[in-house]
UniProtKB/Swiss-Prot annotation:
Keywords assigned by UniProt, alphabetized: Aminoacyl-tRNA synthetase, ATP-binding, Cytoplasm, Ligase, Metal-binding, Nucleotide-binding, Protein biosynthesis, RNA-binding, tRNA-binding, Zinc
Chain's gene name: metG
Top-level EC class as recorded in UniProt: ligase
UniProt record similarity statement: Belongs to the class-I aminoacyl-tRNA synthetase family. MetG type 1 subfamily.
Subunit annotation: Homodimer.
Binding locations of Zn(2+): 144, 147, 156, 160
Domain of life: Archaea
Its EC number(s): 6.1.1.10
Cellular component GO terms, alphabetical: aminoacyl-tRNA synthetase multienzyme complex; cytosol
Keyword tRNA-binding in record: yes
Name of the protein in its database record: Methionine--tRNA ligase
Length: 662
């Protein structure tokens, strides 16, 4: 039976700022996967586009004195060009503000209405009396009702990460003018997401992709599934059918963009787009780990309600840190793709390698210039580049090219073993494992050449030296074929140095065992240049200056009097028990002895400590904080910690629980 085609999509970059390392964590692995799968004989279509709607773009456009459409077009062109420079080769890269996306969004929303999955409801929405406007999503900031942290109107981005519906945020403030907002009634439309609970659980059990996406979504659904408000009071966006005063929520039209972009590609290429979105499709979404909820719960529910096929797989990446700090544009912990990397003349292939080889796709990637330089020099230059150059140089110098004859069976067996392992890893979305396997073959080649020393052997046995080089050339060919999805530009350069005149990407990845014929080859040149310490230091200096500049811009905390400070009660405590909170990847529930009583405290440190690590640990507790419910769990106090990594404050010497901090 013929397999259905593979349609691969990437989460859409938002057109209100330039491309950075966090974006590439999604797009480079997706491109690597697409390149590999095509070269196994699969029919693959690769689409994405820019996300043009929603309040952040409207706010940014107003701040910059331009229109949302002009701002979107500016950054759409930027992303399109940047992805090309990074070797990310989409078949189609569209815009969600294009007519095709408007049409498909309104069609799907109308289907949901007709099928009874959408209803009207009056909600309390933040309203600015000064601006005389309702404040959807990021037009308003305030306090998260679940964890008490600073939050945006649609999401608690600084705390528990929970999606917020209109009217939920506490102490709302207008982001435009800073005026305290009030709540007023307004009619909106909701998707009956709760109606899909019985569908979503078995769907997730069968969903392919990475386990982090599947498990996170299952945790949400097993508790309570809330309906979603799918309209906003904005002029910019896709109009809700029959309502000129409302647009659909950006998380409705953004994923529908995947379908619209497929339609546009199909129209350009004489294909039927419905073939890629039928019931038995293989739609595979590559996304960042922060949008799992939208792609594994909201999106499949929406598709089901509208009568479309469900996603086949969701591949979610881990988050990105910079120099051990949480990725943050406002705090300066960001690496810009163009300004900091490509425009400095650094090879796109080396950054692709780092992103794929640093860690497993689902784990956190911590970028530092120092480690980047070390890995490129020690792995790419010293192992891969060294083997390819020394082998090709010797072949050209001593034999004028590739010697004739056969390849040792043991060498072919090693190549076949490598090809099989790479395929297993790629099919499982384990890109680091695949890269490590390829680099293992390069290391094997280096050891083989070093052990057999053809530069010595040729003095006494030219035929034996020729056999060693023949074997080395065969390994080099296999490496070219296997590394192409990771480093497409350098793989093509190597392919030409092997004497081929076509594209390496036109060949199957398993052709590494097809013998390289006897022929002349051009004089090779080193494929990779070492990154000098001075260059790395200069790149790092730019980052550190950016952090310092951001610190200067940070608003200083106002001074307080000793009387104000005396109102705060801080004591030592000892953790008696700790456990995870269902559905939250950030929060732990702790039982803490503070001297004479045990307090239950919810703390956002789950990303840094396992529950059993905390039991018995001495901590510092703010004890007279008003009780609050966080994620539905009562919290009576606050554990004090320092920095983005939540380093717990603890006494240097043993003290009794309940000792006051003075």
């Amino acid at each position: 039976m013929t397999k259905p085609p593979l349609l691969v999509t990437c989460g859409l970059p938002y057109t209100n700022g330039p491309c950075h390392l966090g974006h590439l964590r999604t797009y480079v692995p997706a491109d690597c996967y697409v390149r590999y799968m095509r070269r196994t004989g699969e029919e693959v279509v690769f689409v994405s586009g820019s996300d043009n709607h929603g309040t952040p773009i409207v706010v940014s456009a107003e701040e910059q004195g331009t229109t949302p459409r002009a701002l979107s077009e500016q950054y759409h062109r930027h992303f399109d060009e940047t992805f090309r420079r990074m070797g990310v080769s989409f078949d189609h890269f569209g815009m969600t503000d294009d007519p095709a996306c408007h049409h498909r969004t309104q069609d799907i929303v109308q289907r949901l209405v007709d099928n009874g999955y959408v209803y009207k409801q009056v909600v309390n929405q933040a309203y600015c009396p000064k601006c005389k406007r309702f404040l959807p999503d990021r037009y308003v900031e305030g306090i998260c009702p679940y964890c008490g942290k600073q939050a945006r109107g649609d999401e608690c981005d600084q705390g528990c990460g929970k999606h917020l519906e209109p009217g939920e945020i506490k102490d709302p403030v207008c982001k435009i003018c800073g005026t305290k907002a009030e709540f007023r009634n307004q009619e909106h439309y909701f998707l009956k997401l709760s109606a899909f609970r019985d569908y979503l659980l078995p769907f997730l059990d069968n969903l392919k992709g990475t386990s982090n996406a599947r498990n996170y979504a299952i945790g949400w659904i097993k508790d309570e599934l809330h309906d979603w408000c799918i309209t906003r009071t904005l002029e910019w966006g896709v109009k809700f059918p029959g309502r000129d005063d409302l647009v659909v929520y950006v998380w409705v039209d953004a994923p529908i963009g995947y379908i619209a972009f497929t339609e546009e590609w199909a129209k350009e290429n004489g294909r039927d787009w419905k073939r890629y979105w039928c019931k038995d499709n293989r739609v595979t979404h590559f996304i960042g780990g922060d949008i799992i909820y939208h792609h594994c719960i909201f999106w499949p529910g929406l598709l089901k309600g509208a009568g479309y096929g469900e996603p086949y797989a969701v591949v979610a990446s881990g988050m990105v840190k910079v120099d051990d700090h949480k990725f943050s544009k406002s705090r300066g912990y960001v690496v810009w793709t163009n300004d900091d990397y490509l425009d400095k003349g650094l090879p796109a292939d080396c950054l692709r390698y780092y992103l794929l080889a640093y860690t497993s796709h689902t784990k956190e990637l911590n970028f530092s210039w120092k480690v980047f330089g070390e890995r490129i020099n020690n792995e790419v230059v010293n192992i891969l580049g060294n083997f390819l150059y020394r082998t090709l140089f010797f072949a050209h110098k001593e034999f004028g090219g590739v010697p004739g004859g056969s390849v040792d069976p043991a060498i072919l067996a090693e190549i076949e073993k490598c090809q099989k392992s790479v395929d297993d890893q790629m099919q499982a979305y384990e890109f680091k494992g695949a890269v490590d396997t390829v680099m293992g073959l390069a290391a094997f080649g280096n050891t083989y050449i070093q052990t057999n020393a053809p530069w010595k052997l040729i003095k006494t046995d030219r035929a034996a030296a020729a056999q060693v080089i023949k074997n080395g050339i065969q390994i080099a060919k296999a490496l070219c074929l296997l590394i192409e999805p990771v480093m497409p530009v350098k793989a093509q350069e190597c392919w030409a140095q092997l004497g081929y005149i076509d594209r390496v990407a036109a060949h199957r990845v398993d052709e590494g065992v097809v013998i390289v014929p006897e022929r002349q080859i051009p004089a090779p040149a080193p494929l990779f240049a070492r990154l000098e310490e001075k260059q790395i230091a200069e790149l790092d200096a730019v980052l550190q200056q950016r952090v310092r500049d951001a610190d200067k811009k940070t608003e200083k905390t106002p001074m307080i009097s000793i009387e104000d400070f005396s109102k705060v009660e801080i004591k030592t405590g000892k953790v008696l028990a700790a456990e995870s909170i269902p559905k939250s990847s950030k929060l732990l529930k702790l039982q803490v002895d503070i001297g004479g009583e045990t307090r239950q405290i919810v703390s956002g440190i789950a990303a840094f400590y396992k529950p059993d690590e905390l039991v018995g640990k001495d901590v510092i507790v703010l004890t007279n904080l008003a009780p609050a419910k966080i994620f539905g769990v009562e919290s009576n106090g606050m554990i004090l910690a320092a920095g983005d990594a939540a380093s717990l404050l603890t006494p240097l010497k043993p003290v009794e629980p309940g000792t006051k901090i003075r």
